[in-house]
Amino acid sequence: MTPRPPANLLHRVLLLLAALCGTLSAQINVELQFPRSTYLVDEPALATLRITNMAGRDIVLGEKTQNGPWCQIQVQAVHGSSPTPRQNSPSFPPLFIRAGETVSRSVNVLDIYDIPSPGQYRVRANIVMESVRDPYVTAPAYFTTDPGKVIWSTTVGVPEEKSAGDSPRTYSVITLKRREGVFLYAKLEARQDGWRFPPYQLGRMLSAMPPQSQTDRENNLYVFHAAEDDLYTLTQIDVATGRSGQAVYRSKTPKGGRPRMERLPDGRLAISGGIRITDEEMKPPAAADRAKLSDRPQGF
């Protein structure tokens, strides 16, 4: 008859195996989060991937493992057909994480998946390590894509001197309701050629003042909207290159009424009744120095 090991020895072996398994399963902690829940269709959906090294030693997440890239993003539609992965999506470079360190990386889900349709989507990140058999899987994170509401649209040509082809361009100005409020967007696309720029987020808008949208003499787009009670944003988008810029205005006088965008007799656009705010004026005031607890009040 084969002798049995002492009960206390068997107990120690089981504890050691459990400790080893626990060490392997707790090497890293991963989280995936979206800063907001709703995005316009085609708007970059940026998620934050946080990885905490709990292995007690420095680790390197390699660019590629036997089971594929070290970071694998999975996107599924909550209802309907799931989106298709892009063929040439960007790769994740190797990541060095010190013991006990937490690192964050931004992941644009639209760089990895083609998501042209509105809907709700479930996203997970799988982190693969050569030393661990099963990948680390994040809890699901959710986001919704919404087509928004088109409030203005026009199709224009591209001036010859800009040499951007003969295909006309279509501008669209869109509102999107989010939990944080109503936000204004613009789109620029060449529908005949089948391409479009990612949507431009123009900022939060006040519904009390409808946005003004016009094109200038070179067919560049200008959108003027109220962002706050006496804060107005002017956005310009170049018809050929898609480059954009913004300027901020306020009323000339407290009782002077709201500024407006107007077309001058020569066709140029101008802001009437508004003063442009400089970058210096937009900076928040410096916080006053707080008294130390050791400072004695005056007179003591």
PLM feature segments, named:
Residues 11-23:
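Bacterial N-terminal signal peptides
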Residues 27-32, 38-40, 44-110, 120-127, ...:
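Contiguous segments within soluble domain cores/interaction surfaces
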Residues 163-187, 212-228, 259-279:
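Short beta-strand elements that form the blades of beta-propeller/WD-repeat-like
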Residues 184-204, 233-251, 278-299:
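Surface-exposed loop/turn elements that mediate protein-protein interactions on large endomembrane-trafficking
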Residues 204-213, 250-264:
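Repeated scaffold domains used in trafficking and secretory/extracellular systems
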